[in-house]
Design a protein with these regions (language model features):
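Substrate-binding/active-site clefts of carbohydrate-active enzymes
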Residues: 1-70, 91-99, 104, 115-116, ...
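Active-site-proximal helices and loops of the catalytic beta/alpha 8
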Residues: 63-75, 80-175
Length: 176
């Protein structure tokens, strides 16, 4: 039995996330799409935890502290970071960084859209005022550019190695 009925998000039948994490930053997003993105399960064997439950959020903080202490960790990788409720995740990052100022937390925010990726980096000047407190994000746009550049011999202005250059030149949208 779950400690609380709302420990995980539950629907009458299995409901998968819509994977539209752009709804987190879209002031015009439908509440339906946002709720499905945050609350839908990633897969049948991967329930979506409900970090809006304050007891679960506290457990999640203590769980991270235990692992950091037990394994002497310098950093954490958070899979599918934007699929969680963003406010509790921000509180989680903030709490861990208050306890461990030199800890690095990297969020997997798998998108090729650079402005949407930048939204998730802590300290970014997001228009909605939201701060994730997430120190690091995985640079999937650079990964995609490198894969594309290294798989062609093209010297056209929009292909090959220039893809890497242009992606790195877009670093101005990131906080740090």
């Amino acid at each position: 039995d779950l400690p609380f009925e709302d420990w995980v998000h539950q629907f009458p039948t299995f409901t998968r996330t819509n994977a539209l994490f752009s709804t987190n930053m879209d002031i015009n997003a439908s509440q339906y799409d946002l709720a499905l993105q945050e609350s839908g399960w990633f897969d049948t064997s991967m329930p979506d935890i409900n970090l809006d439950n304050p007891f679960l959020l506290q457990y999640f903080k203590l769980w991270a502290v235990w692992w950091i202490e037990w394994a002497d960790l310098d950093g954490l990788r958070v899979d599918t970071y934007p699929y969680n409720e963003k406010q509790p995740m921000s509180e989680w990052c903030e709490a861990l960084l208050a306890e461990y100022p030199n800890l690095n937390i990297v969020g997997e925010c798998w998108t090729a859209d650079i402005p949407q990726l930048a939204y998730w980096q802590g300290g970014n000047l997001n228009k909605d005022g939201f701060d994730t407190h997430l120190p690091s994000i995985m640079d999937f746009p650079l990964r995609d550019a490198m894969c594309a550049a290294l798989s062609t011999d093209s010297v056209k202005w929009d292909a090959g190695m220039i893809r890497i250059y242009n992606t790195v030149a877009d670093d101005f949208v990131y906080h740090d």
